[in-house]
Amino acid sequence: MLVAPDQPFPSSVELVLRRYALLVDARGASALGFEAAVAAMAPATKAAITADLKCFLAWCKSRRPVATAVPAEPETLVHYLHWLAKGSDTRPPAKPATLARRIASVARIHRILGFGEKEPLPTQAGMVRDTLKGIRRKKRERQRQAAPLRFGEAMQNGQAPPEGVTVKALLASCGTDIIGLRDAALISLAYDAGLRVSELVAATVADLRQVGDGSGRLEITHSKTDQLGEGALAWLSGDTMARLSAWLLVSGLSEGPVFRRINVLTGPSDAAGQQIVRHYIGDRPLTRQGVVAILRRRVFEAIDLGHVDLEPGMEGDTVRALSAHSFRVGLTQDLFAAGEDGAGIALALRWSSPTTALRYARELAVGNNAAARVLGRLRDGGGQTARSPPANRDIL
């Protein structure tokens, strides 16, 4: 037993440890310290550690002889990394970013259980670090980032507006029916506030506030980098507030989640021969998968309506490169294009550091650096200015 007996519901982390108790030495663990460490984790962090721990413990159990998981031997971790990187018929090879996360979770569990205070953790051994570096070098894989969804305007003099799928194109694909109003409000809010998908689906009516100039504020009560729940405020444009108001008015929502599933039921035709269609709005917030489905549906509709100009055959690749995170990446690039600095963008969009924001502006910077500006004029005709990279064709 790791956690105090009076705790009514063991955490998912503890349940996994209990299941593989014979592989884990928890004698030096503090029940109070374990409970505090798990309680301090954000839900997404707890879910990731639970999955990573379950994977590692199950692998240790399958070894012959069975390998001790905690404390682990560095050699055990090296074999584990190679097993993950190799893949199998039922499991694709793990990417370098996944391997690093798996090892980080193993290290965290060791610390929670009292290891690493008097001697280095096994995850810090040179052979483990070298194995990670070797796999990363062998695969030569840069971590894939979501393709950006930029607004669709030229953000700086001399720059051409982004091409391809843009926020403006998606908004133009939304009709005035109840589903179109919801989708337009969702797209507009996600872009304006640069929301993570977890922040988007967690938004409630009570979190929205309009101010005198027509703009608004969104209170973000929890986020990935705000595990203490201190909260943050995001600015919303007047256009976004108008779209939110239209959606809330037609939906009749006055409290609870802003964005929910809409069920469509069709019935027999009325006296005029028109088919009866009823919309039922659910009580629960949209899921991450629901947001992605809405985004992809709107992309295809924007293409069909002629709001997006793509090369033939690029539709599938374009849609697959986009995710709910694309709004956040696109806004980051638009702010850089407008001349804002990394520190200000990181603060406004709740990035963990300016370095993270700079990474998402990497491709934009290449299209507007000194070489692009000078050679763009020399090679593309005198006086022409280098164009910013397409918003949708930068598929990473």
Where are these regions (language model features)?
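Basic, alpha-helical nucleic-acid-contacting "clamp/cap" segments
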Residues: 211-302
